[in-house]
Amino acid sequence: FLFVGDL
């Protein structure tokens, strides 16, 4: 998880 869309 680095970004919101990386979930």
From Swiss-Prot:
Enzyme class: hydrolase
Enzyme Commission designation: 3.1.3.2
Major site of localization recorded for this protein: secreted
Segment forming the signal sequence: none
A GO CC term attached to the entry: extracellular region
Key words, A-Z: Glycoprotein, Hydrolase, Secreted
Processing after translation: Glycosylated.
Catalyses which reaction(s): a phosphate monoester + H2O = an alcohol + phosphate
Top-rank taxon: Eukaryota
GO molecular function annotation: acid phosphatase activity
Localization per record: Secreted
Membership in a protein family: Belongs to the metallophosphoesterase superfamily. Purple acid phosphatase family.
Other notes: In L.esculentum there are at least two isozymes of purple acid phosphatase.
Subunit description: Monomer.
Protein name: Purple acid phosphatase isozyme LeSAP2
